Amino acid sequence: MGKNVVVLGTQWGDEGKGKIVDLLTEQSKYVVRYQGGHNAGHTLVIDGEKTVLHLIPSGILRDNVKCIIGNGVVLAPDALMTEIKMLKERGVPVEERLLISEACPLILPFHCALDIAREKARGNNAIGTTGRGIGPAYEDKVSRRGLRVGDLFDAELFAEKLKEVMAYHNFMLTEYYKCEAVDYEETLKDALAIADYLKSMCVDVTELLDQARKAGEPILFEGAQGTLLDIDHGTYPFVTSSNTTAGGVATGSGFGPRHLDYVLGIMKAYTTRVGAGPFPTELQCEIGDHLGTKGHEFGATTGRKRRPGWLDVVAMKRAVQINSISGFCLTKLDVLDGLEEVKICVGYQYPDGSVATVTPLAAEGYEQVTPVLETMPGWSENTFGATSVEQLPQAALNYIKRLEELLDTPIDIISTGPDRNETMILVNPFS
């Protein structure tokens, strides 16, 4: 029987999920996105050629894989068409490989307008969203006024629903935020223009995945963003609008949770965060600059500079709990090359001297904490591109071993570069 594997981020996103998903898709028949939208940025490097995907699953470059956008994903038709065009120009037969759930909520222009208007209105208290309409689209879904992909297939009904929801949002834009209204006719025309094209790719995702499971075909579920950005379990309110944790797989695809066999947590060898929000181990110093520069820490979606810091084991323990992580993939180990010492956060100290080893449940709880850091010797040797454990210096091996001890979870994969070949698979999630 084939295994069903989840690959998800354990930090604030940008852990290197895209590369690992691409690597593991060689052994899977289906790759499924189950949450988020085109706010994700998954970078693949294959034989030196770089591909950045925001919405389409990272298995799209494999000719033996069907890629699925599940119902938990908020879908922006314009972003999807842009990505499809880019891939087709590279010779990728997207229509043969991509399938979409009719139940995906649509992101439409007024969602983006609202997202941008809200961030601007927040001023210094801005959350740091991508401005791509993700949050407003999820709001419409929960409020039961959202439009879904399947609504496009009845033009008359879609027009009626669109008029109603746009009247509501345009009122907010013009009267509350003092912004321009979004044009109804143009929005309607653009949406209906691709209805037939999308319909050709729509399937009952729940039924398809269940049949695949019964046939023993391996399925890989590709998470977006990271655990610490989860709407319920992240550093609220500095979070995304979806469940980025393993629980989102079932709700965002219709796949039964008891059928998941392995959860692979992607963990960078240090930590980064894009946008606002608490970050106890942040390094605003020369070492932070080193990590940011050597790690090329700029967002694949927004281009924003990421905030670097030491690896936070307190937060990673929470990720292990929430996701029932089977094993970790440690990425960007090579970025630590050349540092005299490396540090790991093992606790949060409060002003009264008390030390916590679990994360607070909201952003406010982080305001007065300072990280308790454990220091380990660094290494001068080059680990970039290493493909076997024997090539790693002893200090790097000691660092890996210490992380396994602290997290009580094995590190099953080690990544030492952006290319799919620059990887050590110690334990294969599909084996």
Curated annotation (Swiss-Prot):
Subcellular location(s) of the protein: Cytoplasm
Record's cofactor remark: Binds 1 Mg(2+) ion per subunit.
Residues that bind IMP: D14, E15, G16, K17, N39, A40, G41, H42, T130, R144, Q225, T240, R304
Active site residues of this protein: D14 (proton acceptor), H42 (proton donor)
Nucleotide-binding listed as a keyword: yes
Positions annotated to bind Mg(2+): D14, G41
Enzyme class: ligase
Name recorded for this polypeptide: Adenylosuccinate synthetase
EC number in record: 6.3.4.4
Catalytic activity: IMP + L-aspartate + GTP = N(6)-(1,2-dicarboxyethyl)-AMP + GDP + phosphate + 2 H(+)
Main location: cytoplasm
